[in-house]
Amino acid sequence: MSIRAEEISALIKQQIENYESQIQVSDVGTVIQIGDGIARAHGLDNVMSGELVEFANAVMGMALNLEENNVGIVILGPYTGIKEGDEVRRTGRIMEVPVGEALIGRVVNPLGQPVDGLGPVETTETRPIESPAPGVMDRRSVHEPLQTGIKAIDALVPIGRGQRELIIGDRQTGKTSVAIDTIINQKDQNMICIYVAIGQKESTVRTVVETLRKHGALDYTIVVTASASQPAPLLFLAPYAGVAMGEYFMYKGQHVLVVYDDLSKQAAAYRELSLFVRRPPGREAYPGDIFYLHSRLLERAAKLSDAKGGGSLTALPFVETQAGDISAYIPTNVISITDGQIFLQSDLFFSRVRPAINAGLSVSRVGGAAQIKAMKKVAGTLRLDLAAYRELEAFAQFGSDLDKATQAKLARGARTVEVLKQDLHQPIPVEKQVLIIYALTRGFLDDIPVKDVRRFEKEFYLWLDQNGQHLLEHIRTTKDLPNEDDLNQAIEAFKKTFVVSQ
């Protein structure tokens, strides 16, 4: 077979005519310094603040500090494979996380990658982790209650959908338990819950996940975890990833609860990053924008107006105190951002008052707007009565010669403390809460010995399930108290069957 030169030249000419050159321009820089999870790169002149960049070994980073001659990049993954002189390129994208229904029931890291061993998350939708909070005209005032199932909270410091309520206290005072009970109580409430674990032990997160699974709460919960062994950038990003996942549902008109456990560790991680990129330290060595770190996160919690779909995002941030000092820097910052705080006190916790809520220092700035009518009626004076009891209790230790009125207040206060105690992971429906608090505030428990009050409560609930369904149904449907005569008769009828212990 002979090769014909004309055919070959015709083929070559055709290929030359069809050739199209595509020029790919990518903004590339060079790593000039690496260490402690931070890289400095030269040559990325047009990079945006917060933009994702990619290193030669496919590890991603985020531009944090834009300086005159170099860029400070936090590395979102293992940084041991990156070395000086390596190439780093812009992606043109800011940090995003996957969002959607597919995340429900999963445990993911702050980048949205699953860590529960159940395979990939099947979703194509993403949201940027930093997005503007809803504007003034896009919001409406908080008016729907978020029932926690915890009597002391629903009666004294009620939380509404769209509210930011800080849970503050020393370590080991039951902060996480309050959040878990609240999540468990959202079953059948049309609520998506997101639990963000920041700097927690892996074993603690595992326990939380198993508790949620045992109570069937993982069916409507997303767990975002950046454990203590993760690099500081992931601890810093975790709350923003959680709120971005929640916003997806909020803007679709659904109701979301996000728990940040806890923001003290996020602040410490951000302080670490800021010091590594040489930002000047301020009070307690935190950078100057530490307030903005938390305010821009918590302002994204809102109750949207009907025009925007009427969805809501409720935030329960945690802050850990040292020896009950709520006047430290991070606690005072977050107290000033949120719509109230629930203060858990270690003294109460160790004296077996659990949940260990200090009624005097806890407050909800939404208040009665986040309570049903029935609860407002029965719990109106409860806070003041409890505060007065704590004051009298201190004085009563010094003298036994007390007048009748003071003795009555002390007796009522002791019973109030007993009624507000609650077992772990046993949230109580609001209609039952209303009836036991009604019995307390109307004096029906005054002749019940203090040691029998909790047994009285348990047996009263069982009696209501059998004989008082019409009362419970009335509160459930109308949100108001039933006829007081019917209530009084029902409580008296139960008291006749209750046997006081000897």
Curated annotation (Swiss-Prot):
EC code: 7.1.2.2
Region Disordered, annotated ranges: 115-137
Disulphide-bonded residues: none
GO cellular component term, pick one: plasma membrane
Entries under InterPro entries matching the protein: ATP_synth_asu-like_sf, ATP_synth_asu_C, ATP_synth_asu_C_sf, ATP_synth_F1_a_nt-bd_dom, ATP_synth_F1_asu, ATPase_a/bsu_AS, ATPase_F1/V1/A1_a/bsu_N, ATPase_F1/V1/A1_a/bsu_N_sf
Catalytic activity: ATP + H2O + 4 H(+)(in) = ADP + phosphate + 5 H(+)(out)
Keywords: ATP synthesis, ATP-binding, Cell membrane, CF(1), Hydrogen ion transport, Ion transport, Membrane, Nucleotide-binding, Translocase, Transport
Subcellular location(s) of the protein: Cell membrane
Physiological role: Produces ATP from ADP in the presence of a proton gradient across the membrane. The alpha chain is a regulatory subunit.
NCBIfam families with a match to the protein in the record: atpA (TIGR00962), PRK13343.1 (NF009884)
UniProt-recorded name of the protein: ATP synthase subunit alpha
Organism: Geobacillus stearothermophilus (Bacillus stearothermophilus)
Gene of this entry: atpA
